[in-house]
């Protein structure tokens, strides 16, 4: 491994850390790809390629998985209504949320809450 590749790898790690920190701070908001790309001063197309090459997933998939993990936490630790939880964690389309939730957890939010309590 050359010194240049080590430097590039470290720079990419720092850039990923910055965009992940941004995502964790703003995931409740409607984050556009251009917003995330701007944190690294990149064009959205370059950002998408950079993120996928360095994480193995698209930025949108990462963002939605992060949001789903937060919804999961609230489902099993609070009695809040589902619509409140979704709103709190940045989901605005219930139909899309249900599809993603079922794909990820193979159940509905209500059933999961019942099973884990």
Segments (PLM) and residue ranges:
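The short coil/loop that forms the "turn" connecting the two helices of the helix-turn-helix
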Residues: 42, 91-92, 107
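An amphipathic alpha-helical interaction segment
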Residues: 1-7, 11-14, 42-48
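Short, structured helix-loop boundary elements
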Residues: 9, 13-16, 33, 37
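Terminal helix-turn-helix DNA-binding modules in bacterial transcription factors
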Residues: 17-25, 30-34, 53-93, 114-117
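…primarily DNA-binding HTH/wHTH and HhH modules…
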Residues: 98-117
